[in-house]
Design a protein with these regions (language model features):
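Conserved C-terminal RecA-like helicase domain
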Residues: 1-51, 56, 84, 89-95
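Acidic, low-complexity intrinsically disordered tails
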Residues: 443-451
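A short beta-strand element within the Helicase C-terminal
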Residues: 56, 63-80, 114-118
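C-terminal or mid-to-C-terminal helical accessory/interaction module adjacent to the motor/catalytic core
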Residues: 111-192, 210, 388, 394
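Conserved segment of the helicase C-terminal RecA-like domain
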Residues: 80, 90-131
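C-terminal helical accessory/scaffold domains
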Residues: 192-201, 205, 210, 215-392, ...
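Alpha-helix C-terminal capping/helix-coil junction sites
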Residues: 49, 199-200, 405, 424
Length: 451
């Protein structure tokens, strides 16, 4: 078991309480698996379970699909889950339960497998058998009819030249699962609404537009669809068109570009899940809003319900700001009531959105492109600007880079010219890494230089 516990600690640039807790559990042959873990933590746990060194694994549905992790026995304790639309616990779908049970006794791994569902009484036992063992699975339904999906896919079809008229659009949609399930006529108003949005926000142009919710068949040919340069760029970046519009509005704002304003902008997009602001935190974040409003590139909404979501996005932006200011991960977990996996997921998505923003800025506000690109790299690594040159060195993350910088090694050349014994004394470096770092050859080109 030492192999896995060693990988947990040595492979981390920053060891957190989650690593310590997992280490204690793995030493006893058990572990847990959920979306709050980092990719590194999940990979180590999956490896240990696959190699049968970890005997029991407690998991959320993260293991239900997409991970080839067979088990001799799968036990499902809870058969309900909270559903916010019903404001109550609802039964898990048959398809999801069968997907979980499918992990037991996989061909090529076991001769047989066991799937166990826990019933609290005989009545529930009968219900479980009828529903999950003898019942039919739910039908697969198309999600193309939702506005976010329609926005993204219609723009993509137009930008790629797959469709160029509304007639071709309807013909294409009829051949999808969405069309085959007969949903097209039910959502015609939504399709028209999405087209209006794309046109209004300068993502597409519609020539020969016919007013009215329902378009006569003989008029559809005359409506030609064409993506604008902005629409093509948004489609190429594969972000929600609404995200592109939000980013453009921020870049066109009179507020000078700044790190908090840029991070709050990407937090406002539908492509990132924002942190929830609890009732007892509301006053705190309202205070933050009053103190920081001058730096925010998107003004707060007037409506109270919208203001609540605005504060969620502000909380997310502040988490990202703390990340690039090198706040220890353990402090971030406590301050924002989150997990290492959630932090990494936010950081990864933020990096992608900042890249998209830098690409869009070339069309909207070229003067801000360099600032955004720099912030993207800082987000990806969680560092202040001064550490950027050190991050180009292999095996150096944000914590080791800070240790090197604080010890006086502020450039790649100073590290290269150092003695291994000098480097090994720095926290987080050690003898092996010190030998590797000392005497490194100059890279062909440095991306960042301290000035």
């Amino acid at each position: 078991m030492k192999q896995y516990t060693s990988e947990l600690k040595s492979g981390a640039d920053e060891v957190t309480s989650v690593d310590s807790n997992l280490t204690k559990l793995i030493e006893r042959g058990v572990a847990y698996h959920h979306a709050g873990l980092t990719n590194r933590q999940r990979q180590i746990i999956e490896k240990g379970f696959r190699e049968k060194r970890i005997k029991a694994l407690c998991a959320t549905p993260t293991l239900a699909a997409g991970v080839n992790l067979p088990a001799k026995r799968v036990i499902i304790r809870d058969l309900t889950r909270w559903d916010s639309s019903f404001q109550s616990n609802q039964p898990l779908p048959v398809l999801e339960i069968q997907q979980m049970l499918g992990r037991a006794g996989r061909p090529g791994f076991d001769v047989d497998g066991e799937g166990v569902l826990i019933a609290k009484n005989n009545e529930q036992k009968t219900q479980i058998v009828e529903t999950y063992f003898e019942g039919e699975t739910e039908p697969v339904l198309s999600r193309l009819g939702s506005e976010p999906a329609l926005r993204t896919h219609l723009l993509s079809l137009i930008a790629s030249g797959t469709i160029s008229t509304t007639e071709e659009m309807h013909s294409f949609l009829k051949r999808t699962l969405f069309g085959a399930q007969g949903e097209l006529w039910r959502t015609q108003h939504r399709i028209n609404k999405v087209l209006d949005f794309l046109e209004k926000e300068d993502l597409i142009e519609i020539e020969g537009k016919v007013d009215g919710e329902f378009i006569p068949a003989n008029a559809t040919i005359q409506e030609k669809l064409k993506a604008t340069p902005f629409g093509k760029k948004v489609s190429q970046l594969y972000i929600d068109p609404l995200s592109g519009v939000i980013i453009r509005k921020a870049l066109e704002s009179e507020v000078p570009p700044n790190s908090l304003g840029l991070l709050h902008t990407i937090a406002r997009t539908p492509d990132i899940y924002s942190l929830y602001v609890r009732k007892n935190e509301m006053e705190t974040y309202l205070t933050h809003l009053m103190q920081m409003e001058a730096d925010l590139m998107l003004p707060p909404p007037v409506e109270h319900t919208e203001l609540e979501f605005y504060l969620w996005d502000l909380k997310t932006a502040l988490l990202l700001m703390d990340w690039v200011e090198e706040t220890p991960e353990e402090h971030l977990m406590k301050r924002y009531s989150t997990t290492p996996g959630d932090i990494r997921a936010k950081v990864e998505t933020a990096g992608w959105l900042l890249y998209s923003m830098s690409e869009l800025s070339e069309l909207v506000s070229p003067n801000t492109t360099k600032m955004i690109a720099e912030l993207e790299i800082r987000i990806s690594n969680g560092v202040r600007k001064e550490l950027l040159p050190l991050l180009e060195i292999d095996s150096i993350g944000r914590v080791r880079a800070r240790s090197l910088f604080n010890a006086g090694f502020t450039s790649q050349s100073s590290i290269r010219d150092a003695k291994p014994s000098e480097l090994s004394e720095i926290p987080g470096i050690g003898d092996k890494l010190a030998e590797k770092l000392a005497g490194r050859k100059d890279p062909e080109q440095m991306r960042f230089e301290l000035v």
